[in-house]
Amino acid sequence: TLIGTTESEYTGGLAHPSITAAEQAYLLDMASRYFQRDLGVHDVVWTFAGLRPLLAASLDDPKSVTRDYVIDFDRSGPPLLSMYGGKLTTYRKLAEQVVDLLAPALGLASSAWTGAIPLPGGDMPDGDFAGFLAQAQVSHGWLAPTLLHRYARAYGTRIGRLLAGCSQVTDLGEEVLPGLYAQEIHYLRTVEFARTAQDILYRRSKLGVHLAADSEKTLDEWLA
């Protein structure tokens, strides 16, 4: 279960923000209201923190802070577009508005299209995952069912690209961590731009949540 978020003013270094003890206690207290027992720090298997800029209409009034983004498009000279704020849940809307503003300046035609286009790997017929998984079991029956299901859920129709050249488990290469083979690592680095163990274990997947505490160190050493 993923719980969050908190909103606290942050004054530390920008490179490696982390959750504070007070924020963790707040989230555990809030979540405990919905469980039969109280949650404690020992129940937490992973935490992450991020920072986002917020715009205030008045520095004297914290309530004036907006969680939305602001686009400033200066047409007085060469087109200059600046974006402020924004969040994960509005990234697509923001990107479409930016492209719509910039396209005419670049002599390009543009209209919103992302709402009707599936994400990479999501182009399975009629969005039928069960049918897709059944076909994958025929094509890649040599894989353990749990591993095949994870690949199908994570990569969708790109599973063929992930498993290109593989017809048996040994073709996946070294099992660097439980359930994580060299073949998948190579795919994530070359196709999904992963660079570090943290990229692979948390940003491209959530495998790190279910692995031993030293898994990130083990993978970083393997990647070196």
Specify the residue positions occupied by each region the protein language model found:
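C-terminal catalytic lobe of FAD-dependent flavoproteins
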Residues: 1-3, 7-223
